[in-house]
Amino acid sequence: MLGFLSRLGLWASGLILILGFLKLLRLLLRRQRLARAMDSFPGPPTHWLFGHALEIQKTGSLDKVVTWTQQFPYAHPLWVGQFIGFLNIYEPDYAKAVYSRGDPKAPDVYDFFLQWIGKGLLVLDGPKWFQHRKLLTPGFHYDVLKPYVAIFADSTRIMLEKWEKKACEGKSFDIFSDVGHMALDTLMKCTFGKGDSGLNHRDSSYYVAVSELTLLMQQRIDSFQYHNDFIYWLTPHGRRFLRACRAAHDHTDRVIRQRKAALQDEKEREKIQNRRHLDFLDILLDVRGESGVQLSDTDLRAEVDTFMFEGHDTTTSGISWFLYCMALYPEHQQRCREEVREILGDQDSFQWEDLAKMTYLTMCMKECFRLYPPVPQVYRQLSKPVSFVDGRSLPAGSLISLHIYALHRNSDVWPDPEVFDPLRFSPENSSGRHPYAFIPFSAGPRNCIGQQFAMNEMKVVTALCLLRFEFSVDPLRLPIKLPQLVLRSKNGIHLYLKPLGPKAEK
């Protein structure tokens, strides 16, 4: 018996060694293929083991990439470790060559999302992506978005009441966390029809789960030892991720079941149809393909989870960095405030039509997105070869990183790129600009389907903030840019808030 077990152990050890060797061989062949594909693109020197990972994980890494754009025009290889290599692009014609096509997302990055958000619009490709995109597009029509203005305002006012108390202490405080709570509450109301009216999420298992999943997913992407699924699910970090995933899925599944049951009841269905607005789940349950088939429960959950994931973090980043820019440039802050006051006049609240009138605020917001794009990088895998404007090319299977932050600060595209100048986005200055020079919501057929929703929310939130408070920076706690799934700050965004009095906000 002992001899049999000993032989079995030897066989198992041998099998593990063989599998490990085959895995290593596969990785080496992949590296060789990627390196050969990018042979015509010079780039910064790499570490023998970590590639460029040590450089891009340092504080100030975003601005390091910007300096590389001056050394290596158009694009350069970017190695994350020895086996994952992207062509990092930051020039409009290069961006157009890839992102005008609709290639799938790079699995080396986006496969980490699957356990939580499933195969929703973010990670789907091919005919099913096209089908879902077509089905979901009516959900972002302006007739659907109009009633959301009141929801945006309600959640914002709750946050502003909290800020009123904090501002009275006379200290600067980090706004990022509060904006995140408000954005998630807003999204829950727009998705499920209800949120947390007090923005106090300690008892909300769904809020805790979504917040934790976002953090854990970023930590996994940043940690090489967690990239292997088998190893990751055995770690405490992986088990924590699975628990949070289960909590989020249980909540979404429960709401879907309840809503489906309500739609079977004639009276309940009539109540839903007579509400002030349809939420995102209502719309998903109502859509049908050309054959009349509805989305499956699996597809429903994937699209809801995708909407929650994409919707709250990006707007949190956009709003927080915009308020920082307003604090940094008080003359633009005041001009935006005056514009909003003039638009509101004697009204008690914003109307849908008011949003289009916020022209200067919109220009300031776009300039903020140029300098601080909510999503600093997006990734693709080429489904077919691509040829670039300078004659260089890449084969199918190559990985692409579009570095939006570097593109938006490329001095060949933007004169004086570090200067905050909202007039870059005036109609006369925008006319004739390359369509891929400014792409805060990505670009092409796979651009952000919810960009109008996000812009509307950010306009309402920031306008109400500017009416209630005057913002100024804390010179001792300036934000340190941290590129993750969205653009964050390593030390938060600390601002001083000065209440403008009860008559400032209508």
Swiss-Prot record:
Catalytic activity: an organic molecule + reduced [NADPH--hemoprotein reductase] + O2 = an alcohol + oxidized [NADPH--hemoprotein reductase] + H2O + H(+)
Pfam families in the cross-refs: p450
Keyword vocabulary terms for this entry: Endoplasmic reticulum, Heme, Iron, Membrane, Metal-binding, Microsome, Monooxygenase, Oxidoreductase, Phosphoprotein
Positions carrying Phosphoserine: 431
GO CC term, one of those recorded: endoplasmic reticulum membrane
E.C. code: 1.14.14.1
Compartments where found: Endoplasmic reticulum membrane; Microsome membrane
Recorded family membership: Belongs to the cytochrome P450 family.
Protein function: Cytochromes P450 are a group of heme-thiolate monooxygenases. In liver microsomes, this enzyme is involved in an NADPH-dependent electron transport pathway. It oxidizes a variety of structurally unrelated compounds, including steroids, fatty acids, and xenobiotics.
Name recorded for this polypeptide: Cytochrome P450 4B1
Originating gene: CYP4B1
